[in-house]
Amino acid sequence: FAEVGSTVIDNSSAWRMDKTKKLIVPEVNGNDLTIDDKIIANPNCSTIQMLIALAPIHIKYGITRIIVSTYQSITGTGRIAVNQLNNEYNNIEGEMAYKYPIHQNAIPQCDEFEDNGYTKEEMKLINETHKILDPNISVTATAVRVPVIGGHSESINLTLEKSFQIDDIKKLLSESNGIKLEDDTRNFKYPMPIYAKGKDDVCLLYTSDAAD
């Protein structure tokens, strides 16, 4: 398709780390595209939601380190995983998507382990962040599969280059595209996958300032 002039958006991992192709999150680096980009790579789902939240902060304050832990829906594995969860809940034997039960469990493995000890999912978070946001950011990632249908969650700890105030960051995020700030903790209002299901926004809770 690309050879005959069509523009192709590829959702697989085939082109993501290809040096000749751009890895695009529209809210983050969509302006990098030109009319000559006929194959556009789409990042991993966990990378997309993280960078939508972090890009505005990086632009203004400079991120030097990211520590991210993901709690990923079984839908990322596919229908077979949803069937496994439902079967286990109803005490029915069936095909297993994972090597272990997922009902009432958390599995610290998303995709295969690589020689460096990280899983492929964790390396996607690291490598894609470097390609899209900044190759100089130190990134540590942990990915966990949890018995949830419909939404990935992430806990992210940042080290910033410039000094900041929490209220300024909250204002920045609330004014950014693709982000819904939900941080009314006194009234128990915060992001949860059950309420994010079917929505496009990244639901965000900014909790604490460890600068001091």
Can you name each region flagged by the protein language model?
Residues 178-196:
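C-terminal hydrophobic structural anchor segments
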Residues 8-11, 17, 40-42, 67-70, ...:
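General beta-strand structural signal in soluble alpha/beta enzymes
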Residues 2-35:
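Rossmann-fold NAD(P)-binding glycine/threonine-rich loop
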Residues 206-212:
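Conserved small/polar residues in nucleotide/adenosyl-binding loops
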Residues 193-205:
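Short, low-order "capping/linker" segments at domain edges
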Residues 168, 173-182:
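A common structural junction motif
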Residues 28-62:
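Catalytic helix-loop patch of NAD(P)-dependent Rossmann-fold dehydrogenases
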Residues 48, 55-172:
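Active-site-lining helix/loop region of Rossmann-like oxidoreductase modules
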